[in-house]
Amino acid sequence: MSSKSSIQNIFKLSIPIFFANLVIPFVAIVDTGLMGNLDNASYLVATSIAASVFSILFGSFGFLRSGTVGMIAQADGSKDYEEIINIFLRNIAFVIIISLLLIILQTYIYNFSLSIFELSQETKLYFNDYFTFRIYSSFGELTIFVITGLFIGLQKTKTSSLIVGFYSIATVSYTHLTLPTRLMV
């Protein structure tokens, strides 16, 4: 492979990943924007803080994507397709365990998050609503890491980017469609 075609291949693989990484904070930004258009600033404050908490929390599991990429790429290079399936299933099982632990530990995560910020009672109520919504989305959020790692490891970065984009749009749509009913509780 020539140096020029090698560089072209790198760009071909990396550009979709670059754009997918731009989409990842999209959900928190849009949720914050939706809350900012409501008549009460407490919505905006609560969503912004909770979005930051979950950016840090879910970001700490980025190893799921990078670890999946490395293992899948090795198995793909060896043409060991059974191992690719096994790696994917093991990582999904790990995601299930992590998600269940996050749900079990949600009270501690919630209380720790609130101990960092001084919030009014009203803001705490809205923080609780968004926090609960996001903690139960843990499985989906972390599964996306494994799925994108799978496709990046198989050098199908466009597919990986499309999945991230679709998931982000679906999450934003869900928030937009359910926002009025969730705030009236």
What are these model-derived regions, one by one?
Residues F166-A170:
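Transmembrane alpha-helical core residues of multi-pass small-molecule transporters
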Residues P25-V45, L114-Q121, L177:
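Helix-terminus/linker motif at the lipid-water interface of multi-pass membrane proteins
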Residues L44-I104, E141-Q155, T159-S160:
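Small-residue-rich hydrophobic transmembrane alpha-helices
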Residues I29, V146-L150, S173:
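Alpha-helical transmembrane segments of multipass membrane proteins
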Residues I7-F26, V53-S60, Y136, L162:
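Residue-level signal for short hydrophobic patches within transmembrane helices
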Residues M1-S14, I72-F139, S173, L177-L183:
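Short alpha-helical transmembrane segments in multi-pass integral membrane proteins
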